[in-house]
Amino acid sequence: MKSGNPVLRDSTFSNAQPGAAVMTLDGVVNKTGVLLLLCMASFCYAWYQPTVSMPLMMAGAIGGFVVALITCFVPRISPYTGPAYAILEGLLLGGLSAMMEAAYPYIAVQAAALTFGTLAIMLTLYKTRVIRVTEGLKTGIIAATAAIALLYFVGFILNMFGKGIPYIHSTGWIGIGFSLFVVGLAAFNLLLDFDFIENGILNGAPKHMEWYAGFSLLVTLVWLYLELLRLLSKLRGRD
């Protein structure tokens, strides 16, 4: 099993012990719901703290990245690190959304609606097998995701020297096309997440993996929301 989401790996589900409680679909849904509620709660807190938006965003971004790395390497502690990640990412998203809302009214609501709408559509496509998660599809999505991650990393380094990658962040058609591609890629990563989770359940993954699965889905949803914010801001910036 492979996934474009870096927190979902083949080795992740290989630690179930005979006779131990195992991962279930209901458990994954419940744990994911808890993480989403925690994320939304901290989102709302950051939203209503405009005077400290930047510190909250920095704490959420750095803290969330560190916690995500720890969770990837030590999945068994995901019942603790998963909620921590959700809270930290809520601070990041809430602060960023509030800042963008000041420039583009209702952009946060639009991005949230599109995020959950995309989740519902991709889940339907997966469940009905309209799109089948083949090895070829997995390989293509993984390669494209790695390429985007590398591109963003290079852009980050260039920004430190006062430069940047031209066009992709502009409000022109190249920039909008790039954002559409990345949004689509994030959406297709949801398919890989669903596939990996389904296989984890079939293989009898340990119970704590319900939290890890919820954490993994949240990682993809956060990425999708951020990319939708970026896309909507480009479209609104053309007005």
Task: Label the predicted regions.
Residues 1-239:
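A hydrophobic alpha-helical transmembrane-helix feature that marks the membrane cores
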